[in-house]
Amino acid sequence: MILSGEEIRSQLGSNIVIEPFDPARLNPNSYNLTLHSELLTYEEVVLDMRCPSRTRRLHIPAEGLILNPQQLYLGRTAEYTETHNLVPMIEGRSSIGRLGLFVHVTAGFGDVGFRGYWTLEMFAVQPVRIYPGVPICQIFYHQIIGDFAEYASNKYQDNRDIQPSLLYKELPREEDPQLPLGFRD
């Protein structure tokens, strides 16, 4: 069952933390989260799941930043959230989707007990100008039935910034089959 907006408001400070909280962004069954002023892009041409990838930080100026098609941008919400005894989920706003901007490629599902900022996996199908502080996605909450343990992984928990993929920490690393270069940079 999904919580109503009024139920979200009533659980603030106990099972739900949203900081900062603006009552004007509360919807009938969700809350609008806003875009922070920075993005990350990957520098590698090919991303290897078994290796950490270099990133480049971009600032979104007040006059906006144009996102190019066929480029993955990692952003984050400006709001810090905590969820206890509920399952948090985020979904892109329909007004954003109608501009051809995907806000999260796959990871809209959160874990009970998650604390931190939501990393957004943004992908534009055509050039789109974005702005810091724009309401970019909605968070909503499901009740959980049955016994559970709160999220305890240290991989993304308590993050304070945009989080690139940390999948490499879960995978065994194999040696590179290529010969080393005979010169140094």
Region locations from a protein language model:
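DUTPase catalytic domain/fold
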Residues: 1-185
